[in-house]
């Protein structure tokens, strides 16, 4: 029998190596090594096991925003609500809350433009909500509040009137859609009050209160505002305190309470101390939250001025400037405080920055920063109803410090007073101050004096001749 010697009869021979099979095995090994390395570095995570940083939900951002709001950190609350809207851009309730907080935050801003910018942002937010739900009572009520706040901003009269008309319409529709919308009734009462419709305003705020609205901060705040407009300041204080009890970390409420106590201090000097306590409470809350807000320090300084304590007033005014050395309005406020404290030369530097603007060297000089290490340029503030105080105080300081033949203060004052006359010639309170200072400099209102050439030397320190103490333009309510 023939036997093939190449065939093994007792065992199966191993197959020869397949190069494709070997290559596949190597690829699998390489892939496994890569997976193990990625797992070790945390780049991938095993299935069915929660990731270490879970994905945020809309509700988590809303809760975070509510927490920041209750703590009084309005900017952080706004950021949280904005993040919630990224996930649910059509959530009208979130947009309404965001717009409301933006209105509150506008109360804490120091310049007209900052307030206007924030309110316009609020209007954009609530307009999107209305586009999604045009018949939502909550949305329309909040929109009425935003429009009402814009109507009270420093805008041309025609724009203010248009915003107020829109606000009234939105509030009425909101109430018609839901007669239990207590905030809409409160906002409508505030709008009516601004239109001097006192009886109707009183009726609507009473409806809001009697239906359970006394547990809502805005209802209490607006009731306080109505009493304030009626000049019943003690009742206004009581209701502002009720509002602050509901929302204890909103500093603008404490500032308002302080302003009213300070106003009452002219009749009972012990009220000044109470005013200082509320302003200090607002400042303390800001420090606790890490918020740089000069408003409470300005209010404290103005209170000390009324108490006749010029040094304490100047210290607090300077503290406000340290907090915000970039804000033109802060220079104006500090300048007015210095003027009232009879620090006329110091006020001149500050007010020049606010009214005319100043370069880095001049702003350092105003802040008494020596050597000058900061590059802070201050832009001039436009002449408005709120900044005219800085303009005529600056002109008064120039006139009071003028030394004939030694400076050109009167020429500069004439320019400032002409600007004021062009816009406020029909305001007798402003014109009385302007006229008194013009008389010191012998300024003809119809003619700008030529610039005098100052002499190279000056003998002694000039003694200012103060004109009438600058006052805020009278309004229906005490101002900070």
Where are these regions (language model features)?
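Residue-level recognition of tetratricopeptide repeat
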Residues: 66, 100, 104-107, 145, ...
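Canonical tetratricopeptide repeat
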Residues: 97, 142, 187, 221-222, ...
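TPR alpha-solenoid repeat register
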Residues: 94, 139, 184, 218-219, ...
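Long, contiguous interaction/recruitment modules in multidomain scaffold/adaptor proteins
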Residues: 2-56, 176-187, 196
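Ser/Thr-rich, Proline-interspersed low-complexity disordered segments
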Residues: 40-71, 79, 83-86, 90, ...
């Amino acid at each position: 029998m023939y036997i093939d010697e190449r065939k093994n009869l007792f065992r199966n021979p191993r197959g020869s190596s397949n190069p494709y099979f070997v290559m596949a095995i190597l690829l699998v090994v390489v892939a496994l090594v890569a997976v193990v390395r990625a797992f070790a570095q945390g780049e991938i995570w095993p299935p069915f096991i929660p990731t270490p940083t879970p994905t945020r939900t809309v509700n988590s951002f809303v809760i975070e925003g509510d927490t920041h709001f209750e703590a009084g950190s309005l900017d952080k609350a706004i950021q949280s609500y904005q993040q919630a809207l990224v996930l649910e851009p059509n959530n009208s309730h979130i947009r309404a809350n965001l717009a409301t907080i933006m209105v509150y935050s506008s109360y804490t801003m120091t310049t007209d433009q900052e307030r206007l910018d924030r309110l316009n942002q609020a209007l954009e937010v609530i307009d999107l909500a209305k586009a999604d739900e045009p018949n939502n009572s909550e949305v329309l009520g909040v929109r009425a509040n935003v429009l009402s706040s814009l109507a009270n901003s420093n805008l041309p009269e025609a724009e203010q009137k248009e915003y107020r008309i829109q606000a009234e319409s939105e509030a009425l529709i909101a109430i018609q859609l839901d007669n239990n919308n207590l905030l809409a009734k409160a906002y409508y009462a505030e709008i009516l009050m601004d239109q001097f419709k006192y009886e109707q305003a009183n009726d609507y705020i009473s409806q809001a209160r009697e239906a359970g609205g006394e547990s809502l901060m805005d209802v209490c705040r607006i009731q306080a505002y109505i009493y304030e407009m009626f000049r019943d300041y003690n009742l206004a204080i009581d209701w502002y305190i009720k509002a602050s009890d509901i929302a204890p970390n909103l500093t603008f409420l404490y500032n308002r309470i302080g302003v009213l106590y300070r106003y009452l201090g002219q009749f009972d000097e012990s009220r000044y101390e109470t005013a200082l306590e509320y302003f200090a409470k607002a400042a303390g809350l800001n420090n606790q939250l890490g918020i740089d807000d000069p408003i409470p320090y300005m209010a404290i300084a103005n209170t000390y001025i009324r108490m006749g304590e010029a040094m304490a007033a100047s210290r607090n005014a300077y503290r406000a400037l340290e907090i915000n050395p970039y804000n033109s309005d802060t220079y104006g406020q500090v300048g007015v405080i210095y003027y009232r404290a009879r620090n006329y030369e110091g006020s001149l530097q500050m007010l020049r920055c606010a009214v005319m603007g100043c370069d880095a060297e001049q702003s350092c000089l105003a802040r008494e920063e020596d050597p000058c290490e900061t590059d802070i340029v201050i832009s001039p503030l436009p002449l408005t109803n709120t900044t005219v105080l800085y303009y005529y105080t600056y002109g008064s300081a120039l006139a009071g410090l003028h030394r004939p033949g030694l400076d050109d203060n009167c020429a500069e004052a004439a320019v400032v007073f002409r600007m004021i006359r062009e816009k406020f010639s029909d305001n007798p309170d402003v014109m009385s101050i302007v006229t008194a200072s013009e008389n010191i400099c012998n300024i003809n209102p119809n003619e700008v004096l030529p610039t005098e050439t100052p002499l190279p030397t000056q003998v002694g320190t000039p003694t200012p001749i103060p004109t009438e103490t600058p006052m805020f333009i009278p309004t229906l309510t005490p101002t900070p």
